[in-house]
């Protein structure tokens, strides 16, 4: 203890000596940087050949002379890449680091007179030329299926490469009718009706032999039949494929609903007896906000009864209303409530379904007790006009606001579901209308960055123009409808699938 007191008594006068001027000026008057903004806390995903541009905003102490500061940008093992305040850096892999690994960086602002430094750290990863940050799968007019690698963020893709199969596997095109796709971090499966392979499994990352991964971006890792499916059934019908990061991934194969761990980076291996959630399944439907926080999935069986499950390894419940089985003819749409809360917290889920020609919007309450999910409770049953319901195509919700959305023809509508106990289409606002010759193929609401959070980023819409057999990506602010970016006719075919890579 004596040594500690002695050390403190020695240091304190030194601090006053360094920070204090004449008459013992308060250390808060020292010229210094007080904050730096404009550098993301999320990991930057960069590509060789691109240019990283960062323009941080600096806040200084009152009265500071901003001409007295120097700047340094360091990456990796203290490699200086710039001495300017704003960074413009041609991306390359620093010495001693591997592709896709986390690389440290720091922005240093130093006062030349008093030597004080402010350091803002960041992290980035470097990927090869073809490594995707987003993927589009599309059908071509020669009855083959292709995929596109897009790099950057949806708000500003820096590069994109179409016809990736033609580039890397020109002798083995993906043939047959597209039935679905499943992303699994390391790989992408494209399912078809083509016998005997029933589709291809494709690497989405570079080889990492030290960790047993031997395939580069775009290379086939195997056929669906033989790599994923390991059973004895001679034919496969895989469809209704969904990937919810942190929740589960699932598809229906030959009327069997198979559900897998949403965190597994590899494509699943299965047969008729493994990963079975239910059999005699007609349809499965989750919210488009499907992820770890909102993971209810409704399962419609061929006999009409509706089940529900929440994670890949739980037991599906048969939903009941007033003690009787919940029975429907079809599931039309689903979206979840924006709560701002994390995983295993209560929320409401909305389901649009039909029975005997009548449509209703059901609101169920999902409750957790000690992190254990409880049976669904019906909160409200709202009649929906049948003619209207049949004209809608997609339903989804905002991650952060109490808004729901649906599409009719080439328009997107927004409605407020806060304290909603009846559904009135007349109260909805037409948010966006696309060109008359463009068909909405699908809609994908996204969250910011690479993590999980109940927060809106943007929504990506796949649009198809039949006259030119081309597809576009339209990116807009999820809540306001404000256009962020449009990538007009960049896809040489009919887009059928989009995913953000993790």
What do these predicted ranges mean?
Residues 1-4:
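Positively charged n-region of N-terminal signal peptides that target proteins for export
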Residues 14-17:
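C-terminal motif of bacterial Sec signal peptides marking the signal peptidase cleavage site
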Residues 19-168, 453-455, 465-466, 470-502:
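Acidic/polar, low-complexity intrinsically disordered N-terminal segments immediately downstream
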Residues 134, 249, 297, 404, ...:
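Hydrophobic beta-strand positions that form the internal "hydrophobic ladder"
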Residues 164-171, 185-395, 399-401, 414-429, ...:
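Preference for solvent-exposed, low-hydrophobicity sequence contexts
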Residues 174, 327-334, 384-392, 434-447, ...:
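Repeat-based blade/solenoid architectures
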Residues 175-181, 185-188, 238-239, 391, ...:
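Signature of short aromatic-glycine-proline-rich micro-motifs recurring in repeat-based ectodomains
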Residues 422-484:
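C-terminal structured domain segments
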